[in-house]
């Protein structure tokens, strides 16, 4: 059995779990998330705990048990506390600001880059060079952060660009004769 999949998920106050028609849905103060349940995984909800079991003894069922448990744990955490990624803009004249739901970035191009936020994801700019991306869906938050970073990834010589706050950019030395 999967070691990750065996661990039960404790449901915090304010989180409701519903399993119906092969779909697991979690509702909480920050919204509702749903995930289809694979046919090789059984889901049990009892006494504010969520447990997963493989439907048969195959390796695939064991692997999917751990995967489904990890996805469900992320859903429960997302609807109760949420997820966030912090990005830093490093470079002269690099700045970010919000325009409604869109993020306006000045990244050294001849034009401003405007990134529309998908539904369920919010952006904040505490300072001109910091971006906070928040949401209930871990996958969406990470995807939006990766898309914003991709506009101008950190370059290896001066380190200019958009980087995650916990990212270390290893600088190269310039070529010398």
Swiss-Prot record:
Subunit architecture: Part of the 50S ribosomal subunit.
PROSITE patterns found in the cross-reference section: RIBOSOMAL_L6_1
TM helices/strands, residue ranges: none
Protein's recorded name: Large ribosomal subunit protein uL6
Free-text function comment from the UniProt entry: This protein binds to the 23S rRNA, and is important in its secondary structure. It is located near the subunit interface in the base of the L7/L12 stalk, and near the tRNA binding site of the peptidyltransferase center.
Family annotation (Pfam families): Ribosomal_L6
Gene assigned in the entry: rplF
Gene3D superfamilies: Ribosomal protein L6, alpha-beta domain
Family under the similarity heading: Belongs to the universal ribosomal protein uL6 family.
Organism encoding this protein: Cupriavidus taiwanensis (strain DSM 17343 / BCRC 17206 / CCUG 44338 / CIP 107171 / LMG 19424 / R1)
